[in-house]
Amino acid sequence: MLSIVGSSGAGKTTVCKAVMGLLSSNYSISGEVLYRGENLLHCSKKRLQAIYGKEICYIMQNPMTAFNPSLRIGRQLEKTCYLHNPQISRQELQLLVSNTLQQLGLDDLKRILKSYPDALSGGMLQRIMIAAALINQPTILVADEATTAIDACNRIELMQLLRQLCSGGMAILFVTHDLRAASMADRILIMNDGQLVEAGTTEQIFNEPKEEYTKYLLSACTLERR
């Protein structure tokens, strides 16, 4: 797991969108986005459609932008899965949707699946959005502030789930403004004002920070704990 940490406006979400190919043509992107030897910046639209949503999935910062307000949650999750698994049976599809939601601690399945997005809380929508990203069992998960709208108890459970997914072979890019949440990552990148200012293992960042901005973020964590 790789975590990108920085305050609001540091450029974290822009990095996520660049990785996912979601930046508008107003942006100029240099470098490479490599996935299994392919530079995604140079792939065809057809190839990208096969990769994004199936092999590389994105958890957006705002759950309300991820759902169609006119479709029930159950239908949206089924369409997300069926798009990349058209051979799946109806029974398998329903079971996969139910199991994925329960994995995120969502047990009131009947109500959730029949609900429209605006009938659910922000925290519940956040977890459903995470379920939508996990339903196709991606190899890479890009999570932009995935724990922000979730209460403390469910946040801990989600972070534990992310670690379990990593142990199972999934790679995760975990974006957060909170260094404490980033402590579960293997490596951390610190961003400030659109620039990468420090990178290292989690132990190095927490125990041997080199940059003043990193030290500032660490001191902010200490103050919050008090």
What residues fall within each predicted segment?
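Conserved ABC transporter NBD signature motif
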Residues: 28-39
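A short, proline-enriched helix->beta-strand linker immediately N-terminal to the Walker B motif
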Residues: 135-139
